[in-house]
Amino acid sequence: MIRVEIYERLEAAAVAEVLELVEAGARADGLSALNEQTILNLRHGGAEAEPGAHLMIRDAEGTLVGYANLELDNDGVAAVEMLVHPTHRHNGHGEALLAALIKRATAAKCRALTIWAHGDHPTALLLADRHDFTRDRVLWQMRRHLTDADGDGEPAAGITIRSFVPGRDETRLLEVNNAAFADHPDQGGWTVRDIAMREREDWFDPEGLLLAERDVDGQVLGFHWTKVHGSGDSAIGEIYVLGVAPEAQGLKLGAALTTAGLRYLRGRGLDTVMLYVDESNVRAVRLYTGAGFTRWTTDVNYHKKL
């Protein structure tokens, strides 16, 4: 019988074990089984603000071979991510984790359970079907090569694009982010703490966080947060977050910020850029496809009523 251990909080040593497990999975699968926010919460203690649980499976030697993260929101929905070590798959560990997650969420009187399958792995689909989950949301990673012709968008008169200044621009960035993504399930509702956690990450570079500022009053109307994954020849750039304040729609700031960000990434010596977009966002998919992006990987969010 597979034993699933459940913890409200993880000590530093256990967090290190989870991150090692994530790295092992990423080496085998080419992508992380946990999203960025989950990893940030693990590293910086964000789970203290998110009620939920950590579920762990160990082998006979005590080595961590399975992990699941469960977070509860204020609407009674339990969000889950899980992974099993590549050498321990197809042995019932995923089944055991998911059964324990459903039991935990039901006991917490959640009305629904959602789970991300990063990479849309066939095993995830089998588990989802077996437990009556349905596909609820599909996220594409799209990529393209950077070229000299990376867009011709320029800011309108009276608007300057400049780099973020740590310690000065956090509040303004937060305001425009939450206005631009008011209805977005992941990006909306940020706090200063969400920005601070990212500022502490090794990848953070204020030069690559570009703000569109109105000259007359310094109002930030939009931003393009770029990100660089990896190093050396394997490094790849990302259009991490691109947001424009509702009142600035129609000024073509999106095009101007995109161009500025791609130029910045190319200046870093990168030749490939990626981004994430919802499959259901037909307008954005059409825009990115027209800009030369093609689908690279697919993440699927499965949903189950409890």
Swiss-Prot record:
Keyword annotations: Acyltransferase, Repeat, Transferase
Positions with a binding annotation for acetyl-CoA 1: M82, L83, V84
EC number: 2.3.1.189
Gene Ontology terms: biological process: mycothiol biosynthetic process
Domain of life: Bacteria
Enzyme class name: transferase
Catalytic activity entry: 1D-myo-inositol 2-(L-cysteinylamino)-2-deoxy-alpha-D-glucopyranoside + acetyl-CoA = mycothiol + CoA + H(+)
A GO MF term: mycothiol synthase activity
Binding positions for 1D-myo-inositol 2-(L-cysteinylamino)-2-deoxy-alpha-D-glucopyranoside per the UniProt entry: E36, D186, K227, E238, Y276
InterPro entries: Acyl_CoA_acyltransferase (IPR016181), Bact_Acetyltransf (IPR050832), GNAT_dom (IPR000182), Mycothiol_AcTrfase (IPR017813)
Sites where the protein binds acetyl-CoA 2: L242, G243, V244, N281, V282, R283, A284, V285, R286
UniProt cross-references to Gene3D superfamilies, sorted A to Z: 3.40.630.30
Domain called N-acetyltransferase: residue spans: 5-157, 159-306
Keyword Magnesium: no
HAMAP family xrefs: MshD
Oligomer status and interactors: Monomer.
Family: Belongs to the acetyltransferase family. MshD subfamily.
Job description of the protein: Catalyzes the transfer of acetyl from acetyl-CoA to desacetylmycothiol (Cys-GlcN-Ins) to form mycothiol.
Protein name, per record: Mycothiol acetyltransferase
Organism from which the protein derives: Stackebrandtia nassauensis (strain DSM 44728 / CIP 108903 / NRRL B-16338 / NBRC 102104 / LLR-40K-21)
Gene: mshD
